[in-house]
Amino acid sequence: MELKPNVKEIPGPKARKVIEEHHKYMATTTNDPNEYFLVIERAEGVYWIDVDGNVLLDFSSGIGVMNVGLRNPKVIEAIKKQLDLVLHAAGTDYYNPYQVELAKKLVEIAPGDIERKVFLSNSGTEANEAALKIAKWSTNRKMFIAFIGAFHGRTHGTMSLTASKPVQRSRMFPTMPGVVHVPYPNPYRNPWGIDGYENPDELINRVIDYIEEYLFEHYVPAEEVAGIFFEPIQGEGGYVVPPKNFFKELKKLADKHGILLIDDEVQMGMGRTGRMWAIEHFDIVPDIVTVAKALGGGIPIGATIFRADLDFGVSGVHSNTFGGNTVAAAAALAVIEELQNGLIENAQKLEPLFRERLEEMKEKYEIIGDVRGLGLAWGVEFVKDRKTKEYATKERGEIVVEALKRGLALLGCGKSAIRLIPPLIISEEEAKMGLDIFEEAIKVVSERHGYKIH
């Protein structure tokens, strides 16, 4: 049966009961019963079906996890096959061929033609924690640079790198010492008021100069910095695409001072941007790459892929229990195969459709301040006023709700942006359908608040 968005009542009676019980028994995280009231029972292709039978087109990919589809048959087949062999083989103490096969594949597809090794874990946070330890151990340095707007995890180590929302650090000090944050080259919003679309080189120079002339000249000893953590496109910070040459200049700076470049591909890797890795758009080879989310196709897994010469070399410095889980490894291998069998090309093919439609919406609706993206990773930022760029956070939430009521699942990012990240299996027809619903939601909210529509 061919599915299409079909919503009768959301949240329906069954959903309301689940939401009520959830908040009674589950710890408070990021669930919002007023905005994200989707209670998922099952999935098919690019559609969620909720407990009341509502069908919703997914433009969230389960927060960037389900790139190869919400229930990919090849991934499910690989998982079932592995379940008949072995579920867990203690991969950091005993040996198993499944994790080795995955590590070989990750080294094969990693950016650049250099010798690498892999540490397997269960999440993006753990992948970044491993990167922290690899960088400290291999350089014998203790400091790091990260970017304002970044998200690298929520454990105490990675939380010290994260800087997208103050609430993520609230009552959590002290975090890991030695992390300094600098402005990300956001073409739309930056401390210098530079239009980074019109003057990308000026924006790049300001960020690089800030690191060289303010950090290194005044209070951060460059020779004590182990690594620079970055997202090639900031995710939780608002789906911010930096100027194309930024990472080339950052690499020059890093190489000059012997600093490792650590590329967090947790949200933007695995074909999301129309390349296997988002950093491939920027023509540099990072020293360490971290990946998770979409790697497992729904099964928890993380990986830290690093230059082989950075390896610990001493048993016991770092390890874990579930890293290299056999089922997760089987799922990840199936995901990579699916991506290489046309899904990355599909993201490339649909990029012009998203770019054109979203730019048209920006021209039409004054509430849209900025549109940015690559492949099937798009951010639309909403503002109260295009001149002041005042955040339209409340209106952003209303757009998410109106879309949900019409059968489109979205997620916010940044202070007032929405990310559009459908599974890479989405067809052109489904993409157009989702964009139509998105525009309808924008129109309804614009009319409600009196924003100009051209």
From Swiss-Prot:
It is an enzyme of class 2 (transferase). Optimum temperature is higher than 90 degrees Celsius. Pyridoxal 5'-phosphate binds at G124, T125, Q267, T321. Pfam families: Aminotran_3. Its EC number is 2.6.1.13. The keyword Transferase applies. It catalyses: L-ornithine + 2-oxoglutarate = L-glutamate 5-semialdehyde + L-glutamate; L-lysine + 2-oxoglutarate = (S)-2-amino-6-oxohexanoate + L-glutamate. Catalyzes the conversion of L-ornithine and 2-oxoglutarate to L-glutamate semialdehyde and L-glutamate. L-ornithine is the best substrate, but the enzyme also shows good activity toward L-lysine, and low activity toward D-ornithine, D-lysine, 5-aminovalerate, 6-aminohexanoate and GABA. The enzyme activity is specific for 2-oxoglutarate. This is Ornithine aminotransferase. It comes from Pyrococcus horikoshii (strain ATCC 700860 / DSM 12428 / JCM 9974 / NBRC 100139 / OT-3).
